[in-house]
Amino acid sequence: MPLLDSFTVDHTRMNAPAVRVAKTMQTPKGDTITVFDLRFTAPNKDILSEKGIHTLEHLYAGFMRNHLNGDSVEIIDISPMGCRTGFYMSLIGTPSEQQVADAWIAAMEDVLKVESQNKIPELNEYQCGTAAMHSLKEAQQIAKNILDAGVSVNKNDELALPESMLKELRID
């Protein structure tokens, strides 16, 4: 099985909160798709709460679109990581890490402005697969933590695992 790009970087050296360009690719028509690793917590040290990350999933995608979409950028999807340390964001375009970080900060400020649980988009059994698993309070605590810490940039060349280590860690 081919090694996924996200597993070629050293998770023990990742800063968080931080933005990282996880992958770029060209479509057959020439558009650039960029995938960003939006790392909220340090891997293997902390995880986002189940209800908090789920509520953020509902809020964050819309708020990020409000702050990042434009003539040269269109967000395709923002999805939580299975390890619950952040989100992956796929988009058309090539915004800088700083543009993404600025949008992320603005989105976290928006999360803090949500006044009540009933203001969470699509929080109902028709549009959400686990409508009971939400906590605005936990999502707002995550947002506050991001705002308090600030958002830095993780660079792939600084995090790359050596080829010898990738071979050593490989399971056939």
Swiss-Prot record:
Keyword field: Autoinducer synthesis, Iron, Lyase, Metal-binding, Quorum sensing
Superkingdom in the source lineage: Bacteria
Catalytic activity: S-(5-deoxy-D-ribos-5-yl)-L-homocysteine = (S)-4,5-dihydroxypentane-2,3-dione + L-homocysteine
One Pfam short name: LuxS
InterPro entries reported for this sequence: LuxS_sf, Metalloenz_LuxS/M16, S-ribosylhomocysteinase
Any GO MF annotation of the entry: iron ion binding
Free-text comment on the cofactor: Binds 1 Fe cation per subunit.
Binding positions (Fe cation): H54, H58, C128
Cofactor(s) it depends on: Fe cation
Name this polypeptide is given: S-ribosylhomocysteine lyase
Organism: Vibrio alginolyticus
